[in-house]
Amino acid sequence: MIVVLAESALELVPRELWNHPVIQADAKRRGKKPGEILLDRARHHLAMSSLRDASKRGRPDIVHQVLLVFQYSLLNKRGLGRIYIHTQGDYTIYVRWETRIPKNYNNFVSLMEQLYATGRVPPKGEPLIELYKKDLSTLLRELGGRWVVLHESGVKKPFIELGAALLNSVVVIGGFPHGDFTNKWVLEKADAIYKIGDETMDAAQVVYRAITAAEVAAGLL
């Protein structure tokens, strides 16, 4: 199963916010320039009011939670999964299966800021995490040009059947807190759209259940 967390709410503070007092203060506190820190609604809420699509941005914690769920899963440890993070600004992050994601959120933030600064982590040697300028359409095309989406508008399938459908698929999941895909074609061109349960779930919960279903289908559980 290849998971693509699409339109994820992960980005550096955009240029139009660099001079805002909230951003200036946070950057000074951390000893960095405004353009070197992650946009985070928990700290930058007041600065984000005029930002385009503000409700979908500034939530790196979503990416953190998803990566913790995925990287420490049996599916990943057995080599049956890969994950790509497509972000605001059309960057794509690839995380190698053996990468240990920091469980501490502040350490994760520092790791992502290093990634944006250097394009890879670690800066030398074999990279564990890599950052590319690559839009969602290009990424999905490179992954085979076919995908399924987990979305609240989708068809509900029995858990075992869902796992079998996901195990050998590219699975697109929204990485934003509110709203829907800006790229409407993600749903329009999908091979299938499934939903997990009847309640709206956040991204980490969706990924957790998708992984579990795939693990059952693979005989890992």
From Swiss-Prot:
GO terms for biological process: rRNA base methylation. The record marks 61 as: Stabilizes Arg-59. Its EC number is 2.1.1.-. It catalyses: a pseudouridine in rRNA + S-adenosyl-L-methionine = an N(1)-methylpseudouridine in rRNA + S-adenosyl-L-homocysteine + H(+). Keywords: Methyltransferase, Ribosome biogenesis, RNA-binding, rRNA processing, rRNA-binding, S-adenosyl-L-methionine, Transferase. The keyword Cell membrane does not apply. The record marks 59, 100, 103, 107 as: Interaction with substrate rRNA. GO terms for molecular function: rRNA (pseudouridine) methyltransferase activity; rRNA binding. Belongs to the class IV-like SAM-binding methyltransferase superfamily. RNA methyltransferase NEP1 family. Methyltransferase involved in ribosomal biogenesis. Specifically catalyzes the N1-methylation of the pseudouridine corresponding to position 914 in M.jannaschii 16S rRNA. This is Ribosomal RNA small subunit methyltransferase Nep1.
